[in-house]
Amino acid sequence: MQLFTHIYQLKLIPPTGIVNKITNKKGKEIDAGSKTARNFLIKMIDNKTEIEVSYHAKRTVTSGTQIGLSFEQISNMVKGAVGVDGNTLGFGMTFLHELHHTTIGGDYHDSTELFGTGPVVDNMNIIRNELNKQGFNYGERLNYKAIHTKEGNIIPFNESALTSLKYNSSMGKKAHYIKTK
């Protein structure tokens, strides 16, 4: 959990498994990280339904109460970040994204349109925007699908990248995106 502290502002107390909000010396909750992510994660932890998480999937996929995370796929997205923090589609954010697909997370579905976001990406963009306001660079995901181009499969994180994709042109210097395999 330490790896994702800047996103959630929660700490796990081993070996009890108790999750607490991070507080200052006076016991007041620190208003940092994403409040939306923190509240969503607490809601998931408080739910009695267990979610099974696997880290050995070939591709990241979710069904019902099972999440399969692909170490290779997520690592490639982190490495493929251009103009945004690689963690914008890193392990913490991908885990939160996939939780939205579970039965306890809303059972939301991703957009099937060539260009569009859908409810999961929209919820994740709220989290990204809360982090961006604190000086992080998570961008705003403007399309769910990675669009195949001659440069690779591209997920746009600003208008410059989205426009380049819509007009089938090369990514410009101002484009923020994640290139995937």
Predicted regions, residues:
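Extended hydrophobic/Leu-rich segments
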Residues: 22, 32, 41, 53, ...
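An amphipathic, basic-hydrophobic helix/alpha-beta surface used to engage anionic
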Residues: 95
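Intrinsically disordered, low-complexity segments enriched in small/polar residues
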Residues: 15, 25, 31, 62, ...
